[in-house]
Amino acid sequence: MGNKIAVIPGTFDPITNGHLDIIERAAKIFDVLYVAVLNNSSKKPLFTVEERMEMIKQVTAHLPNVAVESASGLTVDYAAKRGATAIVRGLRAVSDFEYEMQIASMNRTLNAEIETFFVMTNTKYSFLSSSMVKEVAQYQGDISELVPEMVNRAIQVKFNK
């Protein structure tokens, strides 16, 4: 059997300690892990895709089996092109599960060869989202425990602090 390849998709605008926790845990399970940075047209991003990719590359530099790429279109198609057999998704709460289950079911319908793996977020990050980080930062709240240090600095620059 060849390498176990997985994809973790997301907008990561910005990457949080919760995202990083899921990436680090998945990197222990899979031989190759692609972090697919999505350009979600329904969201107005704080950071460009390129900026997000660079931040993720920096905070995952200690993980030699992690590759960071941009992706568009269906995640299941991207996963198939990369030879992945798994899509990894982090779950914060039961409310996440309902939405993620619908996506996983659709992905399975589109490509039965690719499984979705749900990873429960560490409880200390169960409340955390990129949107929340941006909102707190916008109002000068302390986000230093919520994001990696270099991401914190980048956010401070964006909000001109």
Curated annotation (Swiss-Prot):
<dbReference type="InterPro" id="IPR004821">
    <property type="entry name" value="Cyt_trans-like"/>
</dbReference>
<keyword id="KW-0173">Coenzyme A biosynthesis</keyword>
<keyword id="KW-0808">Transferase</keyword>
<feature type="binding site">
    <location>
        <begin position="11"/>
        <end position="12"/>
    </location>
    <ligand>
        <name>ATP</name>
    </ligand>
</feature>
<feature type="binding site">
    <location>
        <begin position="125"/>
        <end position="131"/>
    </location>
    <ligand>
        <name>ATP</name>
    </ligand>
</feature>
<comment type="function">
    <text>Reversibly transfers an adenylyl group from ATP to 4'-phosphopantetheine, yielding dephospho-CoA (dPCoA) and pyrophosphate.</text>
</comment>
<feature type="binding site">
    <location>
        <position position="11"/>
    </location>
    <ligand>
        <name>substrate</name>
    </ligand>
</feature>
<feature type="binding site">
    <location>
        <position position="100"/>
    </location>
    <ligand>
        <name>ATP</name>
    </ligand>
</feature>
<comment type="subunit">
    <text>Homohexamer.</text>
</comment>
<dbReference type="InterPro" id="IPR014729">
    <property type="entry name" value="Rossmann-like_a/b/a_fold"/>
</dbReference>
<keyword id="KW-0067">ATP-binding</keyword>
<feature type="binding site">
    <location>
        <position position="75"/>
    </location>
    <ligand>
        <name>substrate</name>
    </ligand>
</feature>
<keyword id="KW-0548">Nucleotidyltransferase</keyword>
<protein>
    <recommendedName>
        <fullName>Phosphopantetheine adenylyltransferase</fullName>
        <ecNumber>2.7.7.3</ecNumber>
    </recommendedName>
</protein>
<keyword id="KW-0547">Nucleotide-binding</keyword>
<feature type="binding site">
    <location>
        <position position="89"/>
    </location>
    <ligand>
        <name>substrate</name>
    </ligand>
</feature>
<feature type="binding site">
    <location>
        <position position="19"/>
    </location>
    <ligand>
        <name>ATP</name>
    </ligand>
</feature>
<dbReference type="Pfam" id="PF01467">
    <property type="entry name" value="CTP_transf_like"/>
</dbReference>
<keyword id="KW-0460">Magnesium</keyword>
<feature type="binding site">
    <location>
        <position position="43"/>
    </location>
    <ligand>
        <name>substrate</name>
    </ligand>
</feature>
<dbReference type="InterPro" id="IPR001980">
    <property type="entry name" value="PPAT"/>
</dbReference>
<keyword id="KW-0963">Cytoplasm</keyword>
<feature type="site" description="Transition state stabilizer">
    <location>
        <position position="19"/>
    </location>
</feature>
<dbReference type="GO" id="GO:0005524">
    <property type="term" value="F:ATP binding"/>
</dbReference>
<comment type="pathway">
    <text>Cofactor biosynthesis; coenzyme A biosynthesis; CoA from (R)-pantothenate: step 4/5.</text>
</comment>
<feature type="binding site">
    <location>
        <begin position="90"/>
        <end position="92"/>
    </location>
    <ligand>
        <name>ATP</name>
    </ligand>
</feature>
<dbReference type="GO" id="GO:0004595">
    <property type="term" value="F:pantetheine-phosphate adenylyltransferase activity"/>
</dbReference>
<comment type="similarity">
    <text>Belongs to the bacterial CoaD family.</text>
</comment>
<dbReference type="GO" id="GO:0015937">
    <property type="term" value="P:coenzyme A biosynthetic process"/>
</dbReference>
<dbReference type="GO" id="GO:0005737">
    <property type="term" value="C:cytoplasm"/>
</dbReference>
